[in-house]
Swiss-Prot record:
It comes from Human cytomegalovirus (strain Merlin) (HHV-5). Its main location: virion. InterPro entries: Herpes_UL130_cytomegalovirus (IPR021038). Keywords: Host-virus interaction, Membrane, Signal, Viral attachment to host cell, Viral attachment to host entry receptor, Virion, Virus entry into host cell. Forms the envelope pentamer complex (PC) composed of gH, gL, UL128, UL130, and UL131A. The pentamer interacts with host NRP2. One of its GO terms (cellular component) is virion membrane. Plays a role in viral entry into host cells. Forms a pentameric complex at the surface of the viral envelope together with gH, gL, UL130 and UL131. This complex is required for entry in epithelial, endothelial and myeloid host cells. Mechanistically, engages host receptor(s) including neurophilin 2/NRP2 to mediate infection. Belongs to the HHV-5 UL130 protein family. One of its GO terms (biological process) is symbiont entry into host cell. It is found in: Virion membrane. Residues 1-25 form the signal peptide. This is Envelope glycoprotein UL130.
Length: 214
């Protein structure tokens, strides 16, 4: 984090030299930060999120894509002419650090994930799926709209594994496909299909007809 701040400071000096832009009146004058002494710069909190965002705006470089699972929350920040009226995002990770990012494909994915993760309907679905004896679950129209806005219509996962039958072995592929759909009456349905194939698409193999008990 300290290295990142030094790099940002260097870019500020470079901008001053090239564009003759005064950097003395930086937003740090209205910015207060609490530094956690151990480890240094592990946590940085700002009195005003707008100040935090606009300070980094002139030399804000996109970060490499990151997994949504690394983050615990986010905040949108509307800026002014100093940031060309852009909307910036403060992304809070699980170590207490904050990323200031412009809108990008991976940032939109993180926002989409975080905005739906804490919704009640999305927390109920895994519990319902693990208890098939519960039958149909009644959900409200609002819950169905939230689910429809955050669901992934189709997902496909592949898993390769080896079946060893003494002297012979074969490379197998397990494909898990799942579908989710919200109908016009706001009812929700799920479908799951599990298929086994041989890696070279052979028809009758241990992969499709294993003599195993799992």
């Amino acid at each position: 984090m300290l290295r990142l701040l030094l790099r940002h400071h260097f870019h500020c000096l470079l901008l001053c030299a090239v564009w003759a832009t005064p950097c003395l009146a930086s937003p740090w004058s209205t910015l207060t930060a609490n530094q956690n002494p151990s480890p240094p710069w592990s946590k940085l909190t700002y009195s005003k999120p707008h100040d935090a965002a606009t300070f980094y705006c002139p030399f804000l470089y996109p970060s490499p894509p990151r997994s949504p699972l690394q983050f615990s929350g986010f905040q949108r920040v509307s800026t002014g002419p100093e940031c060309r009226n852009e909307t910036l995002y403060l992304l809070y990770n699980r170590e207490g650090q904050t990323l200031v990012e412009r809108s990008s494909t991976w940032v939109k994915k993180v926002i989409w994930y975080l905005s739906g993760r804490n919704q009640t309907i999305l927390q109920r679905m895994p519990r319902t799926a693990s208890k098939p004896s519960d039958g149909n679950v009644q959900i409200s129209v609002e819950d169905a709209k939230i689910f429809g806005a955050h669901m992934v219509p189709k997902q496909t996962k592949l898993l390769r594994f080896v079946v060893n039958d003494g002297t012979r072995y074969q490379m197998c592929v397990m494909k898990l496909e799942s579908w989710a759909h919200v109908f016009r009456d706001y009812s929700v349905s799920f479908q799951v299909r599990l298929t086994f194939t041989e890696a070279n698409n052979q028809t009758y193999t241990f992969c499709t007809h294993p003599n195993l008990i799992v």
